[in-house]
């Protein structure tokens, strides 16, 4: 295309002298002597300045441009398209606009090329919108919002920080009668903590093991006036406050029952008087056998072990029966206890006497009242309305009005308008409860917002 255009002031033979120099020029101004464009340098410098506003990496772009222009200005300036495209990719919309604006301002010496150059340069205008065409070329693609991760669980379904003994203790202490069946303990845990609504067989086995192997829990048989299936479980009356200040996160120490055998006999004898009488006769017979060798000692001598407690005598007598006569012969002589001492020992082994008018579990009901003001106490897990019912010992069945777990754990939830902040006053954030599966029941959270989450004291 350029060969058909005769440029004034130059002969065709003069073009061969300009190709002795390398094609990669150091700057755009070197094109002035090769192409005979008087005003080209000015406009190229202006376009370079325009590109410099869009990108600081202009030197590589100008060398790309000069190499394509020095290659002989391919037909309709199409050779400039790749270089200009590269500059548009580096410089953004400002650089492409500067290149596109170069077409109408070409030198008058290239006036026959004006229309074609303007058309070719105008064809670069779509590259100015390259950032909006594909997100790969612009910053918009890097800052787009990521899709929410589906594998993140809500904090309301996280595992509670309580041990199984803590869960059982909380369930028993909130009950009106201070005793629950195994199924009622299961139901209480599932109602309060959504985590335990799955994998029920695993944690229910752990609950049964905790009830069986901890001395702080006692099994109470059903009385005739309470028909049903399964025995009741209650707290040991001597267990006291196992948890520090009512906080169920950690126990102070493991409770050990020193009178476990006697209390088991007392619990077994609560149903029938005949069983109690048989146990008294058995204990007296064991005490008599243990004191049998002592009858051969002189009346004036006193055994050094005469101050031993009846429980120790009971254990010693049981060991003597297991080991046979050699153990009884090797045991030190002991004086025969009087009938009054035998009655006291039997009463000590059998526990407190039972009144026929009282239910058998009346003596097992713990009467400990502690000020549980800890954030992880049962009073903070339950609402004030339920505490009012329990303070007056209402025995009629009613639906428990419990606080949601995310309020006690201070997790506002993903839809909450106040993420990461702890509400020290009355709770007004109800959007965090929408993630809970219990939110469908409108009466369930009645009374929840009447008390603060954490106590200020």
Swiss-Prot record:
<feature type="region of interest" description="Transactivation domain 2">
    <location>
        <begin position="361"/>
        <end position="457"/>
    </location>
</feature>
<dbReference type="GO" id="GO:0030154">
    <property type="term" value="P:cell differentiation"/>
</dbReference>
<dbReference type="InterPro" id="IPR018533">
    <property type="entry name" value="Forkhead_box_C"/>
</dbReference>
<dbReference type="GO" id="GO:0000976">
    <property type="term" value="F:transcription cis-regulatory region binding"/>
</dbReference>
<comment type="subunit">
    <text>Binds DNA as a monomer. Binds TLE1. Interacts with FOXA1 and FOXA3. Interacts with PRKDC. Interacts with AKT1. Interacts with TET1; this interaction may recruit TET1 to specific genomic loci to mediate their demethylation.</text>
</comment>
<dbReference type="InterPro" id="IPR001766">
    <property type="entry name" value="Fork_head_dom"/>
</dbReference>
<dbReference type="GO" id="GO:0030193">
    <property type="term" value="P:regulation of blood coagulation"/>
</dbReference>
<feature type="modified residue" description="Phosphothreonine">
    <location>
        <position position="301"/>
    </location>
</feature>
<feature type="modified residue" description="Phosphoserine">
    <location>
        <position position="303"/>
    </location>
</feature>
<dbReference type="Pfam" id="PF08430">
    <property type="entry name" value="Forkhead_N"/>
</dbReference>
<dbReference type="GO" id="GO:0000978">
    <property type="term" value="F:RNA polymerase II cis-regulatory region sequence-specific DNA binding"/>
</dbReference>
<dbReference type="InterPro" id="IPR050211">
    <property type="entry name" value="FOX_domain-containing"/>
</dbReference>
<dbReference type="GO" id="GO:0045944">
    <property type="term" value="P:positive regulation of transcription by RNA polymerase II"/>
</dbReference>
<feature type="region of interest" description="Transactivation domain 1">
    <location>
        <begin position="14"/>
        <end position="93"/>
    </location>
</feature>
<dbReference type="GO" id="GO:0061178">
    <property type="term" value="P:regulation of insulin secretion involved in cellular response to glucose stimulus"/>
</dbReference>
<dbReference type="GO" id="GO:0071542">
    <property type="term" value="P:dopaminergic neuron differentiation"/>
</dbReference>
<dbReference type="GO" id="GO:0019904">
    <property type="term" value="F:protein domain specific binding"/>
</dbReference>
<keyword id="KW-0238">DNA-binding</keyword>
<feature type="modified residue" description="Phosphoserine">
    <location>
        <position position="309"/>
    </location>
</feature>
<feature type="modified residue" description="Phosphoserine">
    <location>
        <position position="436"/>
    </location>
</feature>
<dbReference type="GO" id="GO:0003677">
    <property type="term" value="F:DNA binding"/>
</dbReference>
<feature type="modified residue" description="Phosphoserine">
    <location>
        <position position="306"/>
    </location>
</feature>
<feature type="compositionally biased region" description="Polar residues">
    <location>
        <begin position="298"/>
        <end position="310"/>
    </location>
</feature>
<dbReference type="GO" id="GO:2000049">
    <property type="term" value="P:positive regulation of cell-cell adhesion mediated by cadherin"/>
</dbReference>
<dbReference type="GO" id="GO:0000122">
    <property type="term" value="P:negative regulation of transcription by RNA polymerase II"/>
</dbReference>
<dbReference type="GO" id="GO:0006325">
    <property type="term" value="P:chromatin organization"/>
</dbReference>
<dbReference type="GO" id="GO:0005634">
    <property type="term" value="C:nucleus"/>
</dbReference>
<dbReference type="InterPro" id="IPR018122">
    <property type="entry name" value="TF_fork_head_CS_1"/>
</dbReference>
<keyword id="KW-0156">Chromatin regulator</keyword>
<dbReference type="GO" id="GO:0000981">
    <property type="term" value="F:DNA-binding transcription factor activity, RNA polymerase II-specific"/>
</dbReference>
<dbReference type="GO" id="GO:0001227">
    <property type="term" value="F:DNA-binding transcription repressor activity, RNA polymerase II-specific"/>
</dbReference>
<dbReference type="InterPro" id="IPR013638">
    <property type="entry name" value="Fork-head_N"/>
</dbReference>
<feature type="DNA-binding region" description="Fork-head">
    <location>
        <begin position="159"/>
        <end position="252"/>
    </location>
</feature>
<dbReference type="InterPro" id="IPR036390">
    <property type="entry name" value="WH_DNA-bd_sf"/>
</dbReference>
<feature type="compositionally biased region" description="Low complexity">
    <location>
        <begin position="280"/>
        <end position="292"/>
    </location>
</feature>
<feature type="modified residue" description="Phosphoserine">
    <location>
        <position position="283"/>
    </location>
</feature>
<keyword id="KW-0597">Phosphoprotein</keyword>
<dbReference type="GO" id="GO:0001228">
    <property type="term" value="F:DNA-binding transcription activator activity, RNA polymerase II-specific"/>
</dbReference>
<keyword id="KW-0217">Developmental protein</keyword>
<keyword id="KW-0804">Transcription</keyword>
<dbReference type="GO" id="GO:0010719">
    <property type="term" value="P:negative regulation of epithelial to mesenchymal transition"/>
</dbReference>
<dbReference type="GO" id="GO:1990837">
    <property type="term" value="F:sequence-specific double-stranded DNA binding"/>
</dbReference>
């Amino acid at each position: 295309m350029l060969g058909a255009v005769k440029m004034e002031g130059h002969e065709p033979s003069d073009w061969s002298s300009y190709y002795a120099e390398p094609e990669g020029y150091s700057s755009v101004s070197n094109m002035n002597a090769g192409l005979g464009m008087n005003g080209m340098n000015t406009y190229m410098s202006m376009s370079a300045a325009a590109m410099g506003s869009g990108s600081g990496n202009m030197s590589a772009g100008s060398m790309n441009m000069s190499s394509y222009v020095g290659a002989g200005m391919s037909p309709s300036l199409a050779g400039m398209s790749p270089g200009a495209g590269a500059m548009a990719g580096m410089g953004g919309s400002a650089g492409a606009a500067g290149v596109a604006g170069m077409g109408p301002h070409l030198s008058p010496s290239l006036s026959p090329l004006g229309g074609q150059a303007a058309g070719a340069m105008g064809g670069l205008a779509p590259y100015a919108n390259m950032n909006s065409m594909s997100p790969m070329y612009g910053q918009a693609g890097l800052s787009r919002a990521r899709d929410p991760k589906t594998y993140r669980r809500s904090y309301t379904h996280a595992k509670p920080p309580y041990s199984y003994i803590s869960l059982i203790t909380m369930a028993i202490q909130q009950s009106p009668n201070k005793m629950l069946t195994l199924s009622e303990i299961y139901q209480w845990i599932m109602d309060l903590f959504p985590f335990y609504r799955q994998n029920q067989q695993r944690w229910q086995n752990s609950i049964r093991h905790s009830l069986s192997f901890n001395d702080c829990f006692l099994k109470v048989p059903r009385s005739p006036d309470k028909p049903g299936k399964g025995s009741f479980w209650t707290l040991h009356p001597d267990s006291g406050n196992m948890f520090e200040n009512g906080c169920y996160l950690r126990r102070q120490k493991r409770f050990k029952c020193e009178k476990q055998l006697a209390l088991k006999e007392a619990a077994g004898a609560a149903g029938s008087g005949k069983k109690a009488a048989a146990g008294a006769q058995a204990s007296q017979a064991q005490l008599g056998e243990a004191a049998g060798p002592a009858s051969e000692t002189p009346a004036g001598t006193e055994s050094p072990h005469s101050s031993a407690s009846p429980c120790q005598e009971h254990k010693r007598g049981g060991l003597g029966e297991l080991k046979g006569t050699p153990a009884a012969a090797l045991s030190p002589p002991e004086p025969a206890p009087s009938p009054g001492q035998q009655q006291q020992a039997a009463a000590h082994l059998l526990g407190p006497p039972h009144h026929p008018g009282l239910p058998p579990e009346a003596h097992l009901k713990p009467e400990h009242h502690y000020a549980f003001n800890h954030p992880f106490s049962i009073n903070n897990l339950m609402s004030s309305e339920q505490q009012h019912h329990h303070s007056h010992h209402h025995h009629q069945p009613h639906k428990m009005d419990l606080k949601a777990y995310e309020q006690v754990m201070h997790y506002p939830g993903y839809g909450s308008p106040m993420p990461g902040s702890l509400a020290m006053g009355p709770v007004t954030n109800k959007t965090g409860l929408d993630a809970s599966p219990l939110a469908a029941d409108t009466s369930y959270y009645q009374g929840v917002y009447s008390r603060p989450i954490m106590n200020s004291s």
